[in-house]
Amino acid sequence: MAKLPVEKMRELERRFGEIEARMSAGPAADVYVKLASEYSELQPVVTKIRAYEKAIAELADLETLLEDKSVDREMRDLAELELPEVKEQIEALEQEMQILLLPKDAADEKSAILEIRAGTGGSEAALFAGDLFRMYERFSAEKGWKVEVLSASEGEAGGYKEIIATITGRGVFAKLKFESGVHRVQRVPETEAGGRIHTSAATVAVLPEAEEIDIEIRPEDIRIDTMRSSGAGGQHVNTTDSAVRITHLPSGIVVTSSEKSQHQNRAKAMQVLRSRLYDAERQRADSERSADRKSQVGSGDRSERIRTYNFPQGRITDHRINLTLYKLDRMMEGEIEEVVDALMADYQASQLAQLGEQQ
């Protein structure tokens, strides 16, 4: 196990005390809101640090007592009984704090942009893309997050060739960031008379929703085209004469939005463009920091096949962590917490291993 960063722990305690003092002094409302946010973030960490320090002090007292030959036998027996319990408590607290003190991803608390595109498999791939979108939509509803479709292109037999949506809520990106990659489906299409299993795929990209403060887009770096647009209709598609296409000239990234209002289109297209540029910048920085990033669960490589959904067997397999569950129906209804948590745990374990190698 990696050693706990004692200096960092002391700094967090010092900062927490400073925030408490400033909040008690009655600052301006906007300052108070910022302090309260930082307070709620630090409180669980500092609570564990203080519990750990208390347990360490108890251990020292017990060891001193056991070394003191003048202490009567009954007291020594009690101390010997307590000693393993305190050591066990310290070990558990150390494990919890290893996770709490891991470097935080600055984007984890952000909302997210969800992009799903049908891949190989024609109409069946579009239907599967629709199934995936509904899965994330239901998971989001359970979490109390708001889902808003920015653009959608329906498949001929249903589903989506492409759908882009915002998922708004605290910590959305932290929960969904490991969903990026190729999702493969194996099932018998409804139109298949012979009952043969077909394999098709859809690509998922989850980007942290960027704000203007996160990334600067210069007016001279974009070209905005207005065009006529029409869709097949349906729940998530609007027919409009005011579709907007924004091209970011330096990167070549193109974003299209087709809401009824041209003003809305421009705002939504800029929202997606900003998030894609922010994500590209994050990935560049991550690649520089970690040469072996591709081997990690959180690599975000969208060409990597990450998961298989086998409908005849009712099985879902995440290939990155060799996790197989036989509860496909429930997962397609949005019950993906078990997989999401397993991916996060695996990622944290790899971070801890790297931390241990560095010390």
From Swiss-Prot:
Keywords annotated in UniProt: Cytoplasm, Methylation, Protein biosynthesis
Cellular location(s): Cytoplasm
Sequence segments annotated as region (Disordered): 280-306
InterPro entries per UniProt: PCRF, Pep_chain_release_fac_I, Pep_chain_release_fac_I_sf, Prokaryotic/Mito_RF, RF-1
Residues found modified as N5-methylglutamine: Q235
Entry PTM: Methylated by PrmC. Methylation increases the termination efficiency of RF1.
Pfam families on file: PCRF (PF03462), RF-1 (PF00472)
GO CC, alphabetical: cytoplasm
GO molecular function: translation release factor activity, codon specific
Annotated SUPFAM superfamilies: Release factor
Organism domain of life: Bacteria
Function: Peptide chain release factor 1 directs the termination of translation in response to the peptide chain termination codons UAG and UAA.
Family membership: Belongs to the prokaryotic/mitochondrial release factor family.
The name this protein goes by in its record: Peptide chain release factor 1
Organism for this UniProt entry: Rhizobium leguminosarum bv. trifolii (strain WSM2304)
